[in-house]
Amino acid sequence: MVSQALRLLCLLLGLQGCLAAGGVAEASGGETRDMPWKPGPHRVFITQEEAHGVLHRRRRANAFLEELRPGSLERECKEEQCSFEEAREIFKDLERTKLFWISYSDGDQCASSPCQNGGSCKDQLQSYICFCLPAFEGRNCETYKDDQLICVNENGGCEQYCSDHTGTKRSCRCHEGYSLLADGVSCTPTVEYPCGKIPILENRNASKPQGRIVGGKVCPKGECPWQXLLXVNGAQLCGGTLINTIWVASAAHCFDKIKNWRNLIAVLGEHDLSEHDGDEQSRRVAQVIIPSTYIPGTTNHDIALLRLHQPVVLTDHVVPLCLPERAFSERTLAFVRFSLVSGWGQLLDRGATALELMVLNVPRLMTQDCLQQSRKVGDSPNITEYMFCAGYSDGSKDSCKGDSGGPHATHYRGTWYLTGIVSWGQGCASVGHFGVYTRVSQYIEWLQKLMRSEPRPGVLLRAPFP
């Protein structure tokens, strides 16, 4: 008769030889040697109840004493290797068991103290998480947040101008007519009509908002308050941009064929050319200054600065556009996707000019894309570092003849800045072509120096550049 111990051993070890031996030993008992599963007087397989009695974990020495005591972490898992179930018996809580098991099974990932600058560490399965103090960030709390406050990183958080300083945190500054608030980043106007603000919109009842009309639509009266109209002998010539009470920026090519300079005027506050509403201010142009490097009939260095005979009076309909600092323009404004261009140019290529001031929202292109496009057209002038492209290549929208000299205005954190001057293009809204604008940032120092200078004799002046 096969002992119960032998049958259990055979079942656990799965040894056919063992079972076979049992079969041989009991052959006389009537079981078939090759079919031990068949029932007989001495069966090999045990009952379910007997099997459950076998599948208990092996007891340690003195197990009968251990079972009388509650689970001990020191005894169960530190003196000897324990299982997840044994750990659960100790902690009596699944979540606490999981937290323990992460560290117990793959080691404590926080043991090397990876979190820097006072950060606290939480162990994870083959990983860890650092909880940083408020002034730090990063995977290991290695980055001091103030080190990220540099001007190339989102303008250092400044509303207007940003300056980096070696060894110290960046500082914010404001344009003339604004002052820095106590937060060190925001700017508030200190004059009634600061540059780059639109009084009509600032004063409008917030309960009745009227968004700016863009996409080649009419600019509502007063919403392009820096727009200037240049005229000679009573005829429309070009557009311009008021940058302070006595100076207007425009395009140099507008003056290539001027003969009677005495009849050149600039009109501010204009909206509808077919009517006079009392908000217009006309001023004779006393002097036109162009770069010495500009060659008439060409496209490079296409910028002009006009000195008015008398300053204009700032009103809700006459406000200058801010002339930004060069670093701010190149580092921040140049990466604003959309800007506004405005003027009374032709509504269609070779079509009639607009009577009401028009405005268009145009996307700025990367210089490389602009260069590639210009190379596809044999007779297209070269795109230089003094220009940039903006607009739509599908021929749907563009600035046009008559818009020349007008502003490319960029909005940033509540203030508008002059970033470009309408210069030239292949036709108007021609498929495959973009509008080309004078890159104002290249001329900031040149413009500022001229505006600080004393008047010089002569109407047309060629000033050294750079």
Curated annotation (Swiss-Prot):
InterPro entries: Coagulation_fac-like_Gla_dom (IPR017857), EGF-like_Ca-bd_dom (IPR001881), EGF-like_dom (IPR000742), EGF-type_Asp/Asn_hydroxyl_site (IPR000152), EGF_Ca-bd_CS (IPR018097), GLA-like_dom_SF (IPR035972), GLA_domain (IPR000294), Pept_S1A_FX (IPR012224). CDD domains: EGF_CA, Tryp_SPc. Substrate binds at D398. Glycans are attached at S112, S120, N205, N382. Its EC number is 3.4.21.21. Keywords: Blood coagulation, Calcium, Cleavage on pair of basic residues, Disulfide bond, EGF-like domain, Gamma-carboxyglutamic acid, Glycoprotein, Hemostasis, Hydrolase, Hydroxylation, Protease, Repeat, Secreted, Serine protease, Signal, Zymogen. GO terms for molecular function: calcium ion binding; serine-type endopeptidase activity. The record marks S113 as: Important for S-112 for O-xylosylation. It comes from the Eukaryota. This is Coagulation factor VII. The lineage of its organism: Eukaryota, Metazoa, Chordata, Craniata, Vertebrata. The gene is F7.
